[in-house]
Regions:
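ABC family nucleotide-binding domain
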Residues: 12-227, 231
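ABC-family P-loop ATPase nucleotide-binding domain
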Residues: 1-23, 233-246
Length: 246
């Protein structure tokens, strides 16, 4: 078994970005997705990153989740400069320290939901018996233990999102990144999913919700607003250099 990294003490910055930029080459022109972002997120904090389409919020999520790298600037995760990590080390972080929940669920359609939840542990080399035990426990946390043998097509949208959350939780990550987690759900189901994230935050997970919906952002303790690749001043949270409250 590969142990999950120990969480940092509550209140300590687990995520720290300094002057982070991201530029994409678009043929004859360059697209500046992020422009000098400074951001601290404390261990155990619950935040929302909001902004319209094209604002840079998804790019920021990809960098925070180690799915992409900055063009310039520095990103430290739990005190370690991410730029110094090898591809293998980055893959280990994505598998063990960060849990991802996507709007589209990203479930394998021909695999049972138990098998879907097992996947991160398969990549980590966990044995079959332990994988199944932990996957069933994760499904139990989201109220779907009895659905373990079912296929994703046999579940509602809300249930599929719960499976995605169980998969994100199965390696006991300290950070949960959710990209528009209620975007495909009806209002009542969306409330239930957000209540689940509220519970996970209360348990000490660092929860980051990426959304354009202020009703979703209202569940976070702090709101970061992104406009044109920059953290914006104005109503909606602790903007400016986006450091956590003292």
């Amino acid at each position: 078994m590969t142990a999950a990294a120990a969480p940092m003490p509550a209140g300590m910055p687990v995520i720290s970005l300094r002057e982070v930029t991201k530029v994409y080459d678009s043929g004859d022109s360059a697209v500046h997705a992020l422009r000098g972002v400074d951001l601290d997120i404390a261990s155990g904090e619950s935040i929302a990153i909001i902004g319209p389409s094209g604002s840079g919020k998804s790019t920021l999520m990809h960098i925070v989740g180690c799915l992409d790298v900055p063009s310039s600037g520095e990103y430290e995760l739990a005190g370690t400069p991410v730029s110094r990590l090898s591809n293998r080390e980055l893959a280990r972080i994505r598998n063990q320290r960060i849990g991802f929940v996507f709007q589209a669920y990203n479930l394998l359609p021909r695999a049972s939901i138990l098998r879907n939840v097992e996947l991160p542990m398969m990549y980590a080399g966990v044995g079959r018996a332990e994988r199944q035990t932990r996957a069933r426990a994760a499904l139990g946390k989201v109220g779907l233990a009895e659905r373990a043998p079912h296929l994703p097509s046999q579940l509602s949208g809300g249930q599929r999102q719960r499976v995605a959350i169980a998969r994100a939780l199965v390696n006991n990550p300290s950070i949960l990144l959710a990209d528009e987690p209620t975007g495909n759900l009806d209002t009542q189901t969306g409330r239930e999913i957000l209540a689940l994230f509220d519970d996970l935050g209360a348990q000490g997970h660092t929860v980051i919700l990426v959304t354009h919906d202020m009703s979703v952002a209202a569940h976070a303790k702090r709101v970061i607003r992104i406009v044109d690749g920059r953290i914006a001043d104005g109503p909606g949270g602790d903007e400016g250099d986006a450091r956590p409250p003292a």
